[in-house]
Amino acid sequence: MIIYRILSTILFLVSLPFYAAVRACRGKYLPGWQEKLGKFHAPDLGDKVIMFHGVSVGEVIALENLIKKTKETFPDYKIVVTTGTKTGQEIAHKKFDNTADFITYFPFDITICVELFLKKINPSIVLIAETELWPTFAAYCRKKNIPLFVINGRISDSTFKSYSLIKGFFKEIFKNYTEILTQSEEDKEKFIKIGAPAEKTQVMKNLKFDVKRIDADIQIEKGKNRIIIAGSTHKGEDEIILSAFEKLKKEFSDTK
């Protein structure tokens, strides 16, 4: 961990001037780069802050219901939402401008950036979606006694193969997490195999299944229509169902 922090800091300090010069010549900077450095103005959030992080669009959308339910359940707490991409920021503002108390970028995983971020946000608890594992951030959360959770955790097969090569490194990282909550039993086993403590790793349902689906094309008034639902059909069964539906439609015109 110490080696990681030293090397990442050196690499960051060496590359930052070069990056800034190139971007200045092009007149275009990485979206949110100042915020990621810890240079942002945050409102006075107090000492009751729940922080959610989703790196981009998919993760942010998956967090929607949980964030809104958290706000309803804990109205005395401030909600902070962070993302790692511009598109993530856009969807976060679209979804949570009336729910979150502050929306910003997640910091670079460099000591000074993480320290500035945590000082300004002062979270009481941090919940990070899916597979965002940041060693320095996790270490500072533990140092400051901030509970840190992975929620909706998942690891793809390709990521699992890569992480397995340095599972000793990840074993150290997971010591800083309070709990790992995964999407499935398979994901749970993957997390454990790359170093997550079994006693800290549990299965939760996939948050994406909780996302509200709005049917804009059909409004069904209960009790006035005959409705046939065909789910999980196999090859050859669709034709049989459609044939039966056509026969019913002739006899009962309100069949849908």
Model region roles, listed by residue range:
Residues 1-2, 166:
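Absolute protein N-terminus
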